[in-house]
Amino acid sequence: MASLAAALAPPPPVRIGYVTDVEGNLDYFRRYVRASGVLRFDDDAETVLRFADDGCRFVFGGDAVDKGDGDVRLCRMLADLSDRYGRDRVALLVGNRDLNKLRFTAELSPEALATPPEAVPGPHWDDAAPRLADYLKSKSLDDSRANRLRWMLEHTLGCPGTFEFRRAELKKLRNEDDVTDDDVVDSCVGEVLPGGALRAYLERASVAARFGSTLFVHGAVDAQTAGFVPDKNTRFRVGRHGDAGFPPTKSFMGERDVDAWVRDLNALLAWGLEDHLARPTFAADGSRGGDCLLALQNRCAVWGRSVVSNCYADGGNVDSRSAKTRRARIWAAVREGASTGAYDARAFEASTKYTSDARDPAVHAWLRRSGVKRVVVGHRPVGDSPALLRAATGGVEVVMADTSFADVAAPDKRGASLVVATFEGDDVERTATRIVGSRADGASYEVRVPAPGDDADADDVLGTVDADGWWCKARCEDGFLFSRGDGRKVEYDLRP
């Protein structure tokens, strides 16, 4: 753990604070701010943010909403911070939970509500999800805007608690107890339209952001996403032959370097938001404004090329043996499809448990050619402390910091866990990784890794894996924390 001298030393000139996947949990975000050393609250009510000093930058890694009663207030805070300090110091990333709310304007429109429940399709990426008609029948519910929204949240958006979380937040914002179902629906739809806090967040956000040698995205930079930008005409549906991302075996790394890729992804976001405003409801052919952004966060719509929703982590770590086996099996089927034309765009969906290869040397080489030495992501939970891949010679460091399922027994699924990630140094091009926080049981941990390529003293075991598949995640009071697992099952071992 850090020495007293280190704790008392002045902060480095450059500090990039990072937090991700807060998902409307305002209490968690406030805990982060108080501990960050990068952000501070400017008011007693803790609603206005400011930087600790002029050397600070901040990245919010996406997924601002869904699983707490602070969606609106968190988005307002983050948008306000961006307005006051600018995008050269504040980067807000889009996550799947942020982008997929653009669906509300079309799917809850009067025209859509006129469609009989029996004719409303289920989510194209999940055949197991109940259709709207079956949902209403199973719960003896009438066909209303509110109940359609409840079905969407529970079975197509993965956030069954959001309806009541929003009701609770509206009560706080309005200082009144009488918040109707229609009020909740109006709020959810209104939040993605001008004047809405989520809309403000999206308009100030990026798909990818770069500070010096560190690249930030929500999901993953892998062999499928690197260099790929969806076409503006990409539809939110199962991918088809002839789509820009077809075939899935094609590499796009030769088409753009990292900076051009970041620029074009962010230009697509800006265009897609304008398109959503211009065409917020369904057209006769089933398309809608912002289709390309809904596709961007939906793996099968872009043939497994979603930089927003692809993910590395498995079993709480960078990778696992079972993940490698699944990845090899899925790719064998994909390559077989190359000879027969029998591709399945859903081969890379979360339902197949597919995860990307964070150690792909071709991707690392592509990143390094543009000067990127570190990739930082969220999206996929990694237990109760971040997962780390150390940069081997010629490689890239990867940090994964979503701990939103740190304590599944806790009401908020986080418990006492906290992640405070900072990338710091004398120069934005050469920053070290420093992560401090607490595990689900409240025990503290620390991760200190020098800038990639730096020979400074460090715990060389951090971010490495042993022969039995145990990854070293952090230094704790009594030794090193190791973990291994499969899927979302994680086991831990504390070693001296």
Specify the residue positions occupied by each region the protein language model found:
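Feature recognizes metal-dependent phosphohydrolase scaffolds
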Residues: 2-496
